[in-house]
Regions:
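HhH-family (HhH-GPD) DNA N-glycosylase catalytic core used in base-excision repair
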Residues: 1-197
Length: 197
């Protein structure tokens, strides 16, 4: 997101939305139906973790428009299946035009799946959600400039995930994950989706 001096902006249907959520039809649907809504389940959180890592250095719309390609390429982000991917699968992924073909990000995804496959069922969900800050301590942002890129909680989550062996999850990526999965509600105070998580 970029800084902006205004609040929510009316969309095509007249409902006020965060300004970033109006730049493309894909963004409108993502903003309205997904971003900031609670995501639970190890595989669902693994998908979001992977997509946020692939987004690093790119625009989110690039990832959003390739999400189905990612889901197909990475076996629906089912941790147990991705953990069994071989070197041949890595080569296949590097040739797949439906995803971002970045060797470091692909390798990190496969390594993270192998590591997470060893965790007890539900552990990733519990672990990530244990870093959700108390909503009462976070005022609703009025403008996009009020929305941070990194917080103490995202820095702590990033460090904790790295300590447990996960790769490609810095504090900014961790905060984007927290926003996308509803750990924090960064919809603007006058956005219709505020509090829908």
């Amino acid at each position: 997101m970029t800084a902006d001096d205004g609040g929510a902006v009316p969309g095509p249907d007249g409902r006020p939305r965060c300004p970033w959520g109006l730049s493309a039809d894909d963004y409108i649907a993502y903003h309205d139906d997904e971003w900031g809504r609670a995501v639970h389940g190890d595989d669902a959180l693994f998908e979001r973790l992977c997509l946020e890592a692939f987004q690093s250095g790119l625009s989110w719309i690039t990832i959003l428009r390739r999400r189905e390609g990612f889901r197909t390429a990475f076996a629906g982000f089912r941790i147990a299946e991705v953990a069994r991917f071989t070197d041949a699968d890595a080569v296949r992924l590097l040739a797949d035009p439906g995803i971002i073909r970045n060797r470091a990000k692909i390798d990190a995804t496969l390594a993270n799946a192998r590591l997470l496959a060893e965790w007890p069922e539900g552990e990733l969900d519990r672990f990530i959600w244990s870093y959700a800050p108390d909503p009462a301590t976070r005022p609703a942002p009025r403008t996009l400039s009020d929305v941070p890129a990194v917080t103490d909680a995202s820095t702590a989550l990033s460090k904790a995930l790295k300590k447990r062996g996960l790769r490609f999850i810095g504090p900014t990526t961790a905060y984007a994950l927290m926003q996308a999965c509803g750990l924090v509600d960064d919809h603007l105070s006058d956005c219709f989706a505020r509090g829908a998580g």
